[in-house]
Regions:
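C-terminal effector/interaction modules appended to NTPase cores
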Residues: 1-155
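Helix-rich effector regions associated with P-loop NTPase G domains
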Residues: 2-17, 43, 72, 81-95, ...
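Catalytic P-loop NTPase motifs of RecA-like helicase/translocase cores
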Residues: 142, 171, 198, 271-274
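Conserved active-site beta-strand-loop modules that form the wall/rim of enzyme catalytic pockets
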Residues: 211-213, 218, 222-226, 254-255, ...
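A conserved segment at the C-terminal end of the G1
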Residues: 221-237
Length: 342
């Protein structure tokens, strides 16, 4: 198949976009240097990224910082990779309280949840998290394939997944049966209701950990956050006053400190969590009950479709593997599309 040639106008547009991107990076770096030379920045200190707003991030000082508490918007130096909520960084606060600081270095991450952007590049969602809370609800319905995407992403990032059925008061038998199917596969599952306040089981697993909510818009992630954090409106107003954005913005992940210890990251809704950054082996590993059959096929290059002697197909036919899970695996292995935001 021949490569489509770009016409002159298309090449001009691509070059112009690239020039504008380079110019923006140069202006950002020049601004950081200007602040430093003018004495507009304080000394370097470690910090935590609470939220990400376009080209700026919201950073707070760590609890044990000898220089005391500080919370500011910051630019990111042009030589740094994209930052994520939950990142630990080195930063220089602005000397003025309402100024803009600069993030000068990214500290090593112990984990990173990421997905492809519209161009197939890495888009960090949250960093340094311990467990991924996959929130589903009777309405809107989350497909099994979407749940499996999150489970694969959690496995690839070495995160502990937990399936959370919210709006339990609206759940039907089919919703509870699906939860039981995943519980039978070995996944931890909870059913609860933010509306009725039945959150004791959830509260027990949050202290001492960094957790992240993921799931479709409308499944009640924000309602769960509001129930867990009675003072959430006050915290949100403080963040909004610094960012200049509204209180109900759902386009960015935000980190909140829990009263009982631990942190919680609330992420925006995602229709489909893309796995285009993962290899086929990584996707297969995210289905542990199926991956255990690897190496039993007659042919080493088996595609697990219609080849004779395929151990996977035989196990499904014998009822030893879930037909639905095997269909999800085949779909994900064939899917190279990037994720799309709600």
């Amino acid at each position: 198949m021949s490569t489509r040639k770009l016409n002159r106008q298309q090449r001009w547009r691509i070059d112009k976009i690239q020039e504008e991107r380079i110019a923006r990076l140069a202006r950002r770096e020049a601004r950081a240097h200007s602040l430093l030379e003018e004495g507009g920045l304080a000394g370097e200190r470690p910090g935590l990224v609470l939220a990400h707003y376009g080209t700026q991030v919201h950073v707070e000082s760590l609890p044990d910082d000898p220089q005391g508490p500080c919370l500011q918007r910051c630019h990111r130096r042009a030589n740094l990779p994209a930052l994520a909520t939950g990142d630990r960084v080195l930063w220089q606060p602005a000397a003025l309280e309402d100024g803009i600081g600069v993030v000068s270095a990214l500290l090593p991450r112990r984990s990173l949840l990421e997905r492809p952007d519209g161009h197939g590049h890495s888009k960090p969602i949250a960093a340094n998290i311990d467990q991924l809370l996959i929130v589903i609800a009777p309405q809107p319905t989350t497909r099994d394939l979407s749940i499996d995407r999150y489970l694969v992403a959690a496995h690839a990032a070495d995160l502990q997944p937990l399936l959370v059925l919210n709006k339990r008061d609206l759940a039907e038998a089919a919703d509870l049966a699906r939860l039981d199917r995943y519980r039978h596969l070995g996944y931890d599952c909870l059913s609860l209701s933010a509306r009725s306040g039945e959150l004791d089981e959830l509260r027990q697993i949050l202290p001492g950990r960094v957790s992240a909510f993921v799931g479709l818009s409308g499944v009640g992630k924000s309602s769960l956050v509001n129930a867990l954090l009675p003072d959430i409106q006050q915290v949100t107003r403080e963040l909004s006053s610094h960012s200049g954005l509204g209180q109900h913005t759902t386009t960015t992940a935000r980190l909140f400190h829990l009263p009982g210890g631990g942190d919680l990251i609330d992420s925006p809704g995602i229709r489909e969590f893309g796995l285009g950054l993962l290899t086929g082996e990584q996707i297969l590993a995210g289905f542990p009950e199926i991956a255990s059959w690897r190496g039993r096929c007659r042919f080493r290059n088996c595609h697990h479709e219609h080849e004779p002697g395929c151990a996977f197909v035989a196990a499904v036919a014998a009822g030893e593997l879930s037909q639905e899970r095997f269909a999800s695996l085949r779909s994900l292995l064939a899917d190279g599309d990037a994720a799309t935001d709600d």
